[in-house]
């Protein structure tokens, strides 16, 4: 019991309390596996006998699909991240311990380009703005990357000018 209390104090993610994307990060990896196994068993035991969850060698940066909301602070700084659980407030996240590193870099690059391309982020309250979300999917074996821009308008202004290529290769 004492060991469990200590492992729950070790937060490796500074955003975990607000973003809700990695609910198990406050536990040791072994405890995470136990909890996930119990959950799978609880919901599937009526239908099948679930196999034991396979351990990862390195349990970080494994998430191959990353969705980021974009917004702007009152001081004009562009932010990207996830919505705080149960709200429309964006938790600004620079990098995430469970998201693919290339996906994080791509989202950071897009965030950095917003000002130079004069792109307005979508405001949920006013319904005004262009960029709502970005979805990045990374093929772990193929290394292919899919980037989806979710816009608040069917028209992408000056779309012929977007010939930027990220250095994530």
Regions found by a protein language model. Give the residues of each.
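Accessory RNA-recognition modules of RNA-modification enzymes
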Residues: 1-169
């Amino acid at each position: 019991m004492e060991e469990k209390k200590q492992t729950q104090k070790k937060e490796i993610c500074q955003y975990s309390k607000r973003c809700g994307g990695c609910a198990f990060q406050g536990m040791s990896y072994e405890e995470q596996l136990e909890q996930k196994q119990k959950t799978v068993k609880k919901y599937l035991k009526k239908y099948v006998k679930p196999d034991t969850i396979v351990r990862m060698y390195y349990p970080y940066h494994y998430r191959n699909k990353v969705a980021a909301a974009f917004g702007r602070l009152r001081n004009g700084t562009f932010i990207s991240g996830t919505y705080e659980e149960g709200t429309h407030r964006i938790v600004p996240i620079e990098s995430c311990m469970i998201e693919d590193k290339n996906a994080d870099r791509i989202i950071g690059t897009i965030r950095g380009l917003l000002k130079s391309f004069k792109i307005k982020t979508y405001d949920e309250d006013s319904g005004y703005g262009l960029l709502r979300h970005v979805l990045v999917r990374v093929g772990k074996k193929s290394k292919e990357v899919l980037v989806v821009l979710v816009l608040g308008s069917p028209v992408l202004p000056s779309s012929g000018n977007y010939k930027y290529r990220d250095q994530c290769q």
